[in-house]
Amino acid sequence: MPKPGILKSKSMFCVIYRSSKRDQTYLYVEKKDDFSRVPEELMKGFGQPQLAMILPLDGRKKLVNADIEKVKLALTEQGYYLQLPPPPEDLLKQHLSVMGQKTDDTNK
């Protein structure tokens, strides 16, 4: 029981689900198995949610593939956060860019 005058803070958790239809796509919600605030169309495209983990957000400074402040804000305001996969690396474009820079450097 908290001491008088001390407010017990509510910890912020999120529950993360993996998409059954889209690789590297995750849905963060506030409560386990509560998708009531997630739009129906999003759920259709997401497929059957597969529980990945339950994660405390308090005291955490960062997440691996998402901005923690954006996640917290989205959970508070809309009740969910959708993490999409990072764009694929275009290795050919990177290589051509580097080669173009080398060509420019040798022509000077």
From Swiss-Prot:
Q: Which Gene3D superfamilies match?
A: YcgL domain
Entry-linked InterPro entries = YcgL-like_sf, YcgL_dom
> In what residue span(s) does the YcgL domain sit?
12-96
Highest taxon listed in the record's lineage = Bacteria
Q: What is this protein called?
A: Protein YcgL
Q: What is the lineage of its organism?
A: Bacteria, Pseudomonadati, Pseudomonadota, Gammaproteobacteria, Enterobacterales
